Amino acid sequence: MRNDVHLGHKARKRFGQNFLNDPYIIDGIVSAINPRPGQNLVEIGPGLGAITEPVGREVDKFTVIELDRDLAERLRNHPELADKLTIHEGDAMRFDFTQLVKPNNKLRIFGNLPYNISTPLMFHLFEFHKDIQDMHFMLQKEVVNRLAAGPGSKAYGRLTVMAQYYCKVVPVLEVPPTAFVPPPKVDSAVVRLVPYEELPHPAKDLRLLERVCREGFNQRRKTVRNCYKALISAEVLEELGVNPSMRPENLTLQQFVAMANWLADNPQH
């Protein structure tokens, strides 16, 4: 049997499809999500329903977003799920999640995300952080390491800072390639992202925070003084509690925000 065919569906490379088929891992993911009736659950990329089916056994209604027309059609005709699902056929990267929000019922989003779009998709979802209760995603293990990293580590970068700006990041479980058909070439992991009710370190202008992150991590081996010399003087860095001789990869989220907020208050620079 071909190793890229699962339940009669051939995995499509352009959609980055790898189908989960390990019952032990599936149980672990569903337990982590802990779906309950009445919750506003949204699955991105339900695929062949490996997580969709067990979640469907716990709840009466939920929403799925699926780009692959054949898979969306399959779900519409699913004997157990058809009546429970609201199916949005299309690209989650362009989806306006505010249309799913209900009064006092924030979104609980989950999915086995295609690894080729996981980072831009998370940046898209962060825009809706006020409407989201939590997110559970299967990702490349390397991406989960980046999301959860601390300053000074190799995995620490722009994605880390922006994810931790919006969310508490909790790695949940590791998943070997053998849990999928076809097996990906990388290890995977499940992560829980819980958006803060109140941002712990709010930026006055997000574009400036993204800019200081981008400039810092593009030159992570330079000193902070050299990296930001066109933007912020060494004296101001000292005032902000930033040591000019350290490297950008050692700066905390709080320090990146302090620099961005200084730039927002001093726009002539």
Swiss-Prot record:
Top-rank lineage group of the source organism: Bacteria
Location relative to the cell: Cytoplasm
InterPro entries the record matches: KsgA/Erm, rRNA_Ade_diMease-like_C, rRNA_Ade_Mease_Trfase_CS, rRNA_Ade_methylase_Trfase_N, rRNA_adenine_dimethylase, SAM-dependent_MTases_sf
MF term (GO), any: RNA binding
Keyword Protein transport set for record: no
Pfam families for this protein: RrnaAD
Residues at which S-adenosyl-L-methionine binds: N18, L20, G45, E66, D91, N112
Keywords attached to this entry: Cytoplasm, Methyltransferase, RNA-binding, rRNA processing, S-adenosyl-L-methionine, Transferase
EC code: 2.1.1.182
A GO CC term assigned to this protein in UniProt: cytosol
Broad class of the protein's primary localization: cytoplasm
UniProt-listed SUPFAM superfamilies: S-adenosyl-L-methionine-dependent methyltransferases (SSF53335)
Family per record: Belongs to the class I-like SAM-binding methyltransferase superfamily. rRNA adenine N(6)-methyltransferase family. RsmA subfamily.
Record protein name field: Ribosomal RNA small subunit methyltransferase A
